[in-house]
Structures are given as structure tokens and as C-alpha cells.
């Protein structure tokens, strides 16, 4: 089995004016495709790992051959992270129900959560991701470098937990529209969070 680039469940311009069409198309067809291609190349002679779903593979990086660990950390990580990212974007959904209640419980308020998430995204130096994760029965905000995922665990990524939603803060995710204004990009994210997808991920793990 080889990994394939997932189709987006919306058109490239569906998130306008918040996320622009050109960035979405390049991000999906060029950047994400490259992670898929590189992960597949690294797995060519590793059948015991090539058949794993990518979300499972990145939890087992300590088991892959040493000469493949970094390339799979970066590229299988990139494939997993972007696959989650695309599903987590949609205009017009509302934070409600059990996930909203859990956010209010664990952060004090939705506004407090957003402020903590924005800080994690804005202060991640260089390239990386900000995440809302479920750790046990508690929600937390974490960030990771490069294409690391909380699913990789603390020893590899410095973070842990099951991702509920994630935000890509690599410059390729926003530079065409926002240039160096990462905080503006982060603010626009709230207009396109797919809270239905986040709620489904939360419900599946709580």
C-alpha cells in the first residue's frame, strides 16, 4: 500500500476571503504531495510499515530503521498533519455541545482557549503547528516543530495527546496572502475551523 494525496472536500476557493485560493491549491497539490511522495519512497523496502495508516506509522517511529527515521518523521508527519488540517477547515460551523463544554471546563472560557491557542501558534519559532489535543480526559494546547505531531509522543515531538484540531504555521501556509503577518493568519483561522470535525474527533476519543 502506498499513501495518496487526499482529495479536498471543498474547492480551493471555498475558504475565501479568509484563506486564499492560490495558497490552498499550492499547499495541497505541491507541498502535501511532496510529503506523500517522499514518505512512499522511504517506505519502498519497509513492507511492515508501508501497510500502516499514516497516523499509526508516526506513533512507531522508534521502531523504523535509523536511516529512515528522520525522513519518515518529516514526511509521514507532513502527510498526517496535512490530512488532518484539510478536514479541519470549513466555513460556517459552530462550536457547541460537548466540545464547547469541555473547552470551557479546561480553559475557563472559549476566549481563554483561543488566546492560548493563538499564543502557541504565534510564538512557535520558525515552522511548525499549534494543536488542541486531548490528553486523557483533559484538553490542552501544545505546539510542535516542523512536521512533528503530538501523536509521535513527548520523546520525539516534545508533545503528546490526540489532535482535535491543528493549525499549520509554516510560511507556505500563509505567506502569499499574509506575508510576514502570521498573527493575522491565525485570527482568520477561527473563521474557517470545522468545529463539526473537531467535535467528531473529540467524541471518538473522550
Swiss-Prot record:
The answer on whether this UniProt entry bears the keyword rRNA processing reads no
Q: Name one GO molecular function term.
A: metal ion binding
Protein family membership = Belongs to the iron/manganese superoxide dismutase family.
Needs which cofactor?
Mn(2+)
Its lineage opens with: Bacteria, Pseudomonadati, Pseudomonadota, Gammaproteobacteria, Enterobacterales
* Root EC class: oxidoreductase
InterPro entries attached to this UniProt entry? Mn/Fe_SOD, Mn/Fe_SOD_BS, Mn/Fe_SOD_C, Mn/Fe_SOD_N, Mn/Fe_SOD_N_sf, SOD_C_sf
Which protein is depicted? Superoxide dismutase [Mn]
Binding locations of Mn(2+): 27, 82, 168, 172
The record's catalysed reaction(s) read:
2 superoxide + 2 H(+) = H2O2 + O2
Query: Which keywords label this protein?
Result: Manganese, Metal-binding, Oxidoreductase
Q: Give the cofactor note text.
A: Binds 1 Mn(2+) ion per subunit.
> Assembly and interactions?
Homodimer.
Q: What is its EC number?
A: 1.15.1.1
The record describes the protein's role as: Destroys superoxide anion radicals which are normally produced within the cells and which are toxic to biological systems.
PANTHER family (alphabetical): 37S RIBOSOMAL PROTEIN S26, MITOCHONDRIAL, SMALL RIBOSOMAL SUBUNIT PROTEIN MS42
Its GO CC terms are: cytoplasm
Amino acid at each position: 500500500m502506498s499513501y495518496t494525496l487526499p482529495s479536498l472536500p471543498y474547492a480551493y476557493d471555498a475558504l475565501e476571503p479568509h484563506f486564499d485560493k492560490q495558497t490552498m491549491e499550492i499547499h495541497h497539490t505541491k507541498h502535501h504531495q511532496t510529503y506523500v511522495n517522499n514518505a512512499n519512497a522511504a517506505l519502498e523496502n519497509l513492507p511492515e510499515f508501508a501497510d500502516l495508516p499514516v497516523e499509526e506509522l508516526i506513533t512507531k517511529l522508534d521502531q523504523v530503521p535509523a536511516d529512515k527515521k528522520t525522513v519518515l518523521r518529516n514526511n509521514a508527519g507532513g502527510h498526517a498533519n496535512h490530512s488532518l488540517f484539510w478536514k479541519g477547515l470549513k466555513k460556517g460551523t459552530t462550536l457547541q455541545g460537548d466540545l464547547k463544554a469541555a473547552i470551557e471546563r479546561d480553559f475557563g472560557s472559549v476566549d481563554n482557549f483561543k488566546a492560548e491557542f493563538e499564543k502557541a501558534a504565534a510564538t512557535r519559532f520558525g515552522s511548525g503547528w499549534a494543536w488542541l489535543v486531548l490528553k486523557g480526559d483533559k484538553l490542552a494546547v501544545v505546539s510542535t516543530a516542523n512536521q512533528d505531531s503530538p501523536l509521535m509522543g513527548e520523546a520525539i515531538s516534545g508533545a503528546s495527546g490526540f489532535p482535535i484540531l491543528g493549525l499549520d504555521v509554516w510560511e507556505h501556509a500563509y505567506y502569499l496572502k499574509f506575508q510576514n503577518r502570521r498573527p493575522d493568519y491565525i485570527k482568520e483561522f477561527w473563521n474557517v475551523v470545522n468545529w463539526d470535525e473537531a467535535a467528531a474527533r473529540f467524541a471518538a476519543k473522550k
